[in-house]
Amino acid sequence: MSETAPKPETVEIYTDGACSGNPGPGGWGAILRFKGIEKELKGGESPTTNNRMEMMAVLVALNTLTRSCAVDVYTDSEYVKKGMTEWLRGWKARGWKTADKKPVKNDDLWKALDEAAARHKVSWHWVKGHAGHPENERADALAREGIADLRART
């Protein structure tokens, strides 16, 4: 009888970004869950865009992990999911140009996300935003707190 290797422990990451105006002041939020323990992260910057805040949420969350691991990322951003799973390979092959030869928008964050994701075994999942998904709703609240914190500092 052969033993099967146990499934590696998986970190769950739930992310969201928000922007008050696009561009405008923006915030991001992330929840990391591992073995029932949660860590919440949030931040903001201005001026920025909603897409950049969606990306920052994932980037900061992945960079918070201190060792390589299996990760399930849950995002309501098709831009982030498709960018990482469908578009990134082509952009890199074309020297960070789109299929119609234009520079990739947010290439600084795409490069950083690519590097951060490469340190882990990441599975990307899309969830419908504002549809009652508890972790997505919490990540959205954190992103909005990120905007509020930013405004309180300025």
Curated annotation (Swiss-Prot):
Binds 1 Mg(2+) ion per subunit. May bind a second metal ion at a regulatory site, or after substrate binding. Mg(2+) 1 binds at residues 16, 54, 76. Mg(2+) 2 binds at residues 16, 140. GO terms for cellular component: cytoplasm. It is found in: Cytoplasm. Keywords: Cytoplasm, Endonuclease, Hydrolase, Magnesium, Metal-binding, Nuclease. Its EC number is 3.1.26.4. GO terms for biological process: DNA replication, removal of RNA primer. It catalyses: Endonucleolytic cleavage to 5'-phosphomonoester. GO terms for molecular function: magnesium ion binding; nucleic acid binding; RNA-DNA hybrid ribonuclease activity. Residues 7-148 form the RNase H type-1 domain. Its cofactor is Mg(2+). It is an enzyme of class 3 (hydrolase). Belongs to the RNase H family. Endonuclease that specifically degrades the RNA of RNA-DNA hybrids. Monomer. This is Ribonuclease H. It comes from Paramagnetospirillum magneticum (strain ATCC 700264 / AMB-1) (Magnetospirillum magneticum).
